[in-house]
C-alpha cells in the first residue's frame, strides 16, 4: 500500500486539479457494503462573484477493489476552498472523479448547498442503479430550514 498523504505533513492543494487522491485495497473485497463520507463544511467560490459558497456533501459508495483513503479525500475537498465553480460542477465533478478513479461498483453524491440570494440549491448525482443487496440509508440532510 503506497499512499502520498497518510502519515505525512501534507498541505491543502491550491486547486482540485493539483490535488491527488490515494486509494488503498478494499479490505473486504467480495462483500457488498456501503461507505459514507459526510462533509458538513464544504466550501468553494462562486465563479462569477468570488463569494464563498457552502455545502453539506454526502458521498456514498459501494467499493470494488479499492477504497479512497480519507486524508487524501479531505485534502482534495479542501482544495475547493479557493476554486471558482458552480454548485453543479463541484458536486458532479467530485462524484465523477471518485467513481472513475476508484472504479467503485456504485457511487452517489448529494450536495446540499446553503442559500445565496435566498435560494438553496441541492445537487444529486449517482453512477447508475443502486445495488439491490446493499443497505442504502437516506442521506439524512433535511430540506433547508436554516440547516
Swiss-Prot record:
Substrate binds at residues 68-70, 87-88. GO terms for biological process: queuosine biosynthetic process; tRNA modification. Its EC number is 1.7.1.13. It comes from the Bacteria. Pathway: tRNA modification; tRNA-queuosine biosynthesis. It catalyses: 7-aminomethyl-7-carbaguanine + 2 NADP(+) = 7-cyano-7-deazaguanine + 2 NADPH + 3 H(+). The active site is at residues 46, 53. It is found in: Cytoplasm. Pfam families: QueF. GO terms for molecular function: preQ1 synthase activity. GO terms for cellular component: cytoplasm. Residues 1-23 are annotated as: Disordered. Its main location: cytoplasm. SUPFAM superfamilies: Tetrahydrobiopterin biosynthesis enzymes-like. Keywords: Cytoplasm, NADP, Oxidoreductase, Queuosine biosynthesis. InterPro entries: GTP-CH-I_C/QueF (IPR043133), NADPH_dep_7-cyano-7-deazaG_red (IPR050084), QueF (IPR029500), QueF_type1 (IPR016856). Belongs to the GTP cyclohydrolase I family. QueF type 1 subfamily. HAMAP family: QueF_type1. Catalyzes the NADPH-dependent reduction of 7-cyano-7-deazaguanine (preQ0) to 7-aminomethyl-7-deazaguanine (preQ1). This is NADPH-dependent 7-cyano-7-deazaguanine reductase. The gene is queF.
Amino acid at each position: 500500500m503506497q499512499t502520498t498523504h497518510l502519515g505525512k505533513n501534507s498541505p491543502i492543494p491550491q486547486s482540485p486539479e493539483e490535488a491527488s487522491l490515494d486509494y488503498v485495497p478494499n479490505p473486504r473485497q467480495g462483500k457488498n457494503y456501503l461507505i459514507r463520507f459526510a462533509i458538513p463544511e464544504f466550501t468553494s467560490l462562486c465563479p462569477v462573484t468570488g463569494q464563498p459558497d457552502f455545502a453539506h456533501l454526502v458521498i456514498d459508495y459501494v467499493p470494488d477493489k479499492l477504497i479512497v483513503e480519507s486524508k487524501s479525500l479531505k485534502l482534495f475537498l479542501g482544495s475547493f476552498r479557493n476554486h471558482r465553480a458552480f454548485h453543479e460542477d463541484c458536486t458532479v465533478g467530485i462524484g465523477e472523479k471518485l467513481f472513475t478513479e476508484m472504479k467503485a461498483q456504485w457511487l452517489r453524491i448529494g450536495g446540499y448547498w446553503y442559500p445565496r440570494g435566498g435560494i438553496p440549491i441541492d445537487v444529486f448525482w449517482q453512477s447508475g442503479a443502486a445495488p439491490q443487496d446493499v443497505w442504502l440509508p437516506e442521506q439524512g440532510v433535511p430540506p433547508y430550514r436554516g440547516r
